[in-house]
């Protein structure tokens, strides 16, 4: 029977749960990164023919930041103390991500990925297509190891995400032949191409931890906003980054006239003279790389594009933090996830 103490007991129970969560052992992102790499290194490839599976193993062995699996494990670790339990689904998402890179490299005819020869150059284009297709299936096979009760929501989310990423890639390709791409269209394209997989990884981690639906959804929104900030920062670093830190040559987007947030806004905000000069540099003519990158960067400086992009990054980062604030957990549970996203964005706090 209900008594005046009923509410009090309920509150005490809730507080004791929160207290337990506070005292749990949290893994650092560095520890989780090491676990992901060790797990990937030990994955067996026992099927034949070897020529189909060697490129898959090769692509996954090239390293990388492992952002998506680490985010999934950090998300799970908000509620549960055994992130090792979900290493296979975390690696499934990393397998899928690397499959998209394998096919991207083929579409771009890229020579290098993470300082190593790309699959279609090391083997050939047909191998890259077939191994890539198989890699997508392997990602599903690895994801299907999650417990039966959670399998349906996880597969539904992952499948929707995979479709969205394909849509984002197609939009990106379509934009190459258009001169009227708007800022909103560009933001939607990078949301689909980049953000949704970060969001998906975070939400799957929450689902597998048995988190409340509202918290899982808040983490998805957090990932979406952080993903937008992350991609815009990539655009910015392509122009203003240090090549040593950035890991690739500066000005790649400028050289191929890629419709980035920066170029779209430069055209929108340029005066007649600046627009004419931008159009000249973005025409099909062959230009000296150094000369073209310097000229377009100077135009960006004149128009104030760097500050504009930095403000937009700040906006999405702040929006993301608001969604993380909404996750109903003690603040100390979120410290590691906050620190990791700050590190992703190369921020001190």
Question: Can you annotate each of these PLM segments?
Answer:
Residues 13-349:
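All-alpha prenyltransferase/terpene-synthase fold signal
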